[in-house]
Design a protein with these regions (language model features):
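Short, solvent-exposed loop/turn elements at beta->coil junctions and helix N-caps
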Residues: 34-38
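Short beta-strand-to-loop junctions in surface cap/lid or active-site-entrance loops
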Residues: 46-55
Length: 289
């Protein structure tokens, strides 16, 4: 996943989409590919379910446009899980993938914000809608620092959490196509947790605080457990109630553990991918322990 220069390789949106579709075709016996919805610039958002469990754990990345590495790594992770499931191989000689995912399946969403991802990779010309393209150009934001979606909205702060404050007309909670599609998906499934992956220089696991002492203790326990079994060093902390965040929305509405996991993705942080591949399996393994 890295070039000789040490710079991470970021696959195109099309490569991510068709890789997920291909996995759904190749491993159709135990996977299900679907399109969750469309972005504002009419890019389809791919989802791949792996396993035959009745309940689900969500693994999500690519919420902000600047997160250029994790979407490709989640595609790689999906392929690794599918191969291990089909062949009956354990991962790290411990995690029996088929057994775990037939108990609780994983729903992979590697790229929630394809428009922002494409802008950061290929510039404003990647936006097909001329109105959006011109509007965002006029804001004077660097393409490489652009975090929003095709309308310039930060999806990470667009979910209808408690005490959400609308700051501008048209920026009410849940206003964006990507947000609406994910909300519908989260509410359609019986799920047991949300693992939201983001890119940082140092690893950290944040758990969301919500109503109910028992729920909070359970979320804290799971976060501490995952931290204990991680490879790279980092910290664990309670996530401050963040207005409009996906993680806070899930904790409030679905009332299951909601974790934001910050993964180091630079080349010298090679343990980052190992954490990424083990944490979903360890989470499922630990749910009923």
């Amino acid at each position: 996943m890295y070039q000789k220069t040490g710079q991470p390789v970021s696959p195109s949106y099309e490569k991510i989409y068709f890789s997920m579709w291909e996995l759904g075709q190749r491993y159709g016996r135990f996977t299900k590919f679907r399109v969750m919805g469309e972005s504002h610039d009419q890019r389809m958002i791919p989802v791949l379910e792996i396993g035959e469990g009745e309940e689900t754990v969500f693994c999500i990345s690519g919420i902000r446009g600047t997160e250029a590495v994790l979407p490709g790594l989640l595609v790689k992770l999906s392929e690794e899980y599918c191969k291990a499931y089909e062949c009956g191989w354990p991962i790290e000689e411990f995690y029996e993938v088929k057994e775990l995912l037939d108990n609780i399946r994983i729903c992979m969403i590697p790229l929630l914000n394809p428009d922002g991802y494409e802008v950061c990779q290929n510039g404003w010309t990647s936006l097909r809608n001329p109105i959006y393209r011109q509007m965002l150009r006029m804001q004077g934001i660097s393409e490489k620092e652009f975090q929003g979606n095709g309308r310039g909205i930060d999806i990470k702060k667009n979910f209808p959490t408690l005490f959400y404050t609308r700051t501008r007309i048209g920026r009410e909670p849940g206003s964006e196509n990507e947000t609406k599609a994910l909300i519908h998906l989260l509410q359609d499934y019986r799920s047991r947790g949300l693992l939201s992956f983001s890119e940082k220089q140092k690893k950290a696991i944040h758990y969301c605080h919500t109503s109910g002492i028992i729920r909070n203790k359970r979320s804290c326990r799971l976060a501490r457990h995952l931290h204990k079994y991680s490879v790279s060093s980092g910290e664990i902390c309670k996530k401050e109630k963040e207005e409009g965040s996906l993680e806070q929305f899930y904790a409030e509405r679905i009332k299951e553990p909601s974790l934001e996991i910050e993964i180091p993705v630079t080349e010298e942080k090679e343990n980052g991918y190992r954490d990424l591949r083990l944490l979903p399996l360890e989470y499922i393994f630990s749910l009923d322990v």
